Amino acid sequence: VLVNGTFAQGCELDDYYDQGGGHPGAATVPVILALAQQQTVSGQELITAMVAGFEAGWRIGRALLPELMTRGYHAQSAVGVFIAATAAGKILRLDPEQMTHALAIAGSHSGGTMEYDQSGGEVKRLHNGMACCGGLRSSPWRAPSRCSWSSRKSACTTR
């Protein structure tokens, strides 16, 4: 996923949505193809996962941009992880609660600064690959346990 995600945006030939969400195809396709190689997935499930990833990217991107970039964050790195987690969650058939947890975990993988713009670094090429990996790592965390905050301490329980 890291290699395919990096390659998907590395040559700057990928899709682009200028009102938010960056490059949803670059964050969706590597993840759903990797999961489809590991389990049986129908064409309809692939398309549904792709559409869900695009939709998540557009909605989250529109909510965060342009402020995200003016604060120094690369939109694809920050939003792409949610795109990837949503697409992976659809392929893995997560229920709404599991998807919520996957997206919450994806938030911890979100990041990537625009420093490459100032220094000419090539790390930008890696941002989408890292977003794909973060989204993929976020989604399998759907075990039947739940962590919540009590009044004074964190308590994890199993159902």
Give short role names for the model-derived ranges:
Residues 1-158:
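N-terminal core-entry segment
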